[in-house]
């Protein structure tokens, strides 16, 4: 069995989780972007990652989820705290790490039950969605603080420091 592709996905996924953690530590959860508070943008991004990375057809919402809590088009009575979002991120990380540890490269071509995309397509779609929202959320931090939240890459050879929350 080959694991070259899965190992590349693992590396990029771990980097994604580090960047999400930095984002959650630096953003203002109450900042309003497109009529919604940033906490809701964070939850939308994390919920999508949780639902779509593995198999959206076999997904169970987290226990705290209520209808439309993940929607950026519908306001919510509930509010999620930074701590709740950080805990949710850690649960997603554990779930996805276990999933990736169960795969080999050949399995990336398989189409999960009920899906139209193969496993690789589902994963790639979440990288795209995740980083689009991370950029939006980090932009609000830049606007408010005039500081650029650190976005970590996979090589660490850019010459930039990899320590701290800001570039």
Language model feature labels by segment:
Residues 1-14:
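Extreme N-terminal tail/first-helix region
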Residues 10, 21, 26-71, 113-167:
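Short, contiguous alpha-helical
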Residues 13, 34, 42-46, 78, ...:
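Generic structural signal for well-ordered secondary structure
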Residues 13-17, 93:
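Hydrophobic faces of stable alpha-helices that mediate helix-helix packing
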Residues 16, 27-31, 103:
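Short secondary-structure junctions and interdomain/linker hinges
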Residues 19-20, 81:
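A generic structural signal for ordered secondary structure
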Residues 73-110, 120-131:
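Acidic/histidine-rich alpha-helical segments that form the ligand environment
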């Amino acid at each position: 069995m080959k694991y070259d592709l899965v190992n590349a996905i693992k590396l990029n996924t771990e980097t994604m989780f580090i960047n999400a953690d930095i984002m959650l530590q630096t953003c203002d959860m109450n900042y309003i972007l497109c009529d919604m508070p940033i906490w809701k943008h964070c939850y939308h991004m994390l919920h999508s990652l949780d639902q779509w990375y593995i198999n959206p057809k076999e997904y169970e919402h987290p226990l705290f989820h209520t209808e439309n809590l993940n929607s950026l088009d519908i306001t919510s009575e509930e509010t999620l705290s930074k701590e709740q979002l950080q805990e949710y991120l850690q649960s997603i990380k554990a779930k996805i790490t276990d999933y990736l540890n169960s795969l080999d490269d050949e399995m990336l071509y398989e189409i999960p039950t009920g899906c139209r995309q193969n496993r690789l397509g589902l994963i790639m779609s979440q990288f795209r969605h995740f980083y689009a929202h991370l950029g939006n959320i980090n932009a609000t931090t830049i606007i408010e603080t005039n500081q650029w939240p650190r976005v970590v890459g996979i090589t660490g050879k850019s010459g930039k420091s990899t320590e701290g929350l800001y570039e």
